[in-house]
């Protein structure tokens, strides 16, 4: 049952901007399950499959653009790569620091508050840019936001959506770009960590639950992003921050 709960938490919190890693760590503590970074990474791979389904149209469009040698699509891929670099470098250089943060609920509590603030401000931001209109500097800025999302308590979807809106992307485009740029990072981290674990029926069930609940949460996030109702999650993150602070 605990593995089903963790899979459900991962799927719902990975895309809803409330930090899946922060919730997994907190609930592992509450349910007396020893935090396992490798198992968490495997669940991230399960939700990665949900991302691919969600942005499948954009992925196909990009691939067609590359095969037909359209310059703007090569430029878009380069921007996505640029957005990926900061998190990759930071994760490689400070891997031990990142892993240690998973055991400190006080730190996680602070990061939940960072997520809450970014979501509250996001509802007030407006943008008109498409994928092809952002600059390489814009892509780097969004990537820097993704970099700090490595820490538990900071929502990757929430903070990168905030970054994309900050540089002027239209709301739905900002959401889609957030997930497109997340694919390489989640895939890399997942492969790196899952090589350390042995697959069993429990973790596979967790992965399936994470995938299905992830698809549901993506649809919810899309609707709330467009309707500018992300502050709902901001209030929730403040509540979780308080709980994590006193539990820790």
From Swiss-Prot:
<dbReference type="Pfam" id="PF02673">
    <property type="entry name" value="BacA"/>
</dbReference>
<dbReference type="GO" id="GO:0015293">
    <property type="term" value="F:symporter activity"/>
</dbReference>
<keyword id="KW-0961">Cell wall biogenesis/degradation</keyword>
<keyword id="KW-0046">Antibiotic resistance</keyword>
<dbReference type="GO" id="GO:0046677">
    <property type="term" value="P:response to antibiotic"/>
</dbReference>
<keyword id="KW-1133">Transmembrane helix</keyword>
<feature type="transmembrane region" description="Helical">
    <location>
        <begin position="174"/>
        <end position="194"/>
    </location>
</feature>
<feature type="transmembrane region" description="Helical">
    <location>
        <begin position="228"/>
        <end position="248"/>
    </location>
</feature>
<keyword id="KW-1003">Cell membrane</keyword>
<dbReference type="GO" id="GO:0009252">
    <property type="term" value="P:peptidoglycan biosynthetic process"/>
</dbReference>
<keyword id="KW-0378">Hydrolase</keyword>
<comment type="function">
    <text>Catalyzes the dephosphorylation of undecaprenyl diphosphate (UPP). Confers resistance to bacitracin.</text>
</comment>
<feature type="transmembrane region" description="Helical">
    <location>
        <begin position="40"/>
        <end position="60"/>
    </location>
</feature>
<feature type="transmembrane region" description="Helical">
    <location>
        <begin position="74"/>
        <end position="94"/>
    </location>
</feature>
<protein>
    <recommendedName>
        <fullName>Undecaprenyl-diphosphatase</fullName>
        <ecNumber>3.6.1.27</ecNumber>
    </recommendedName>
</protein>
<feature type="transmembrane region" description="Helical">
    <location>
        <begin position="4"/>
        <end position="24"/>
    </location>
</feature>
<dbReference type="GO" id="GO:0071555">
    <property type="term" value="P:cell wall organization"/>
</dbReference>
<keyword id="KW-0812">Transmembrane</keyword>
<dbReference type="GO" id="GO:0050380">
    <property type="term" value="F:undecaprenyl-diphosphatase activity"/>
</dbReference>
<keyword id="KW-0472">Membrane</keyword>
<keyword id="KW-0997">Cell inner membrane</keyword>
<keyword id="KW-0573">Peptidoglycan synthesis</keyword>
<dbReference type="GO" id="GO:0008360">
    <property type="term" value="P:regulation of cell shape"/>
</dbReference>
<dbReference type="InterPro" id="IPR036458">
    <property type="entry name" value="Na:dicarbo_symporter_sf"/>
</dbReference>
<comment type="similarity">
    <text>Belongs to the UppP family.</text>
</comment>
<feature type="transmembrane region" description="Helical">
    <location>
        <begin position="134"/>
        <end position="154"/>
    </location>
</feature>
<keyword id="KW-0133">Cell shape</keyword>
<dbReference type="GO" id="GO:0005886">
    <property type="term" value="C:plasma membrane"/>
</dbReference>
<feature type="transmembrane region" description="Helical">
    <location>
        <begin position="201"/>
        <end position="221"/>
    </location>
</feature>
<feature type="transmembrane region" description="Helical">
    <location>
        <begin position="101"/>
        <end position="121"/>
    </location>
</feature>
<dbReference type="InterPro" id="IPR003824">
    <property type="entry name" value="UppP"/>
</dbReference>
């Amino acid at each position: 049952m605990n593995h089903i709960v963790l899979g459900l938490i991962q799927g719902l919190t990975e895309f809803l901007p409330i930090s899946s890693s922060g919730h997994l760590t907190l609930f592992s503590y509450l349910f007396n399950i020893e935090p396992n970074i490798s198992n968490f990474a495997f669940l991230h791979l399960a939700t990665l499959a949900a991302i691919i389904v969600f942005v499948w149209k954009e992925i196909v469009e990009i691939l067609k653009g590359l095969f037909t040698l359209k310059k703007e699509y090569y430029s878009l891929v380069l921007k996505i790569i640029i957005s990926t670099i900061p998190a990759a470098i930071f994760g490689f250089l400070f891997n031990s620091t990142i892993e240690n943060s998973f055991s400190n609920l006080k730190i996680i509590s602070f990061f939940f508050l960072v997520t809450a603030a970014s979501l509250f401000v996001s509802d007030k931001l407006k943008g008109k840019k498409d994928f092809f209109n952002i600059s390489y500097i814009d892509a780097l800025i969004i990537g820097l936001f993704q970099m700090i999302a490595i820490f538990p308590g900071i929502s990757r979807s929430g903070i990168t959506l905030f970054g994309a809106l900050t540089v002027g992307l239209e709301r739905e485009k900002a959401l889609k770009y957030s997930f497109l740029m997340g694919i390489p990072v989640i895939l890399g981290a997942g492969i790196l960590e899952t090589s350390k674990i042995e697959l069993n029926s429990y973790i596979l069930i967790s992965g399936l639950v994470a995938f299905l609940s992830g698809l549901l949460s993506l649809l919810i996030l899309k609707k709330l992003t467009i309707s500018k109702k992300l502050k709902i999650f901001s209030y929730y993150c403040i509540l979780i921050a308080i709980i994590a602070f006193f539990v820790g």
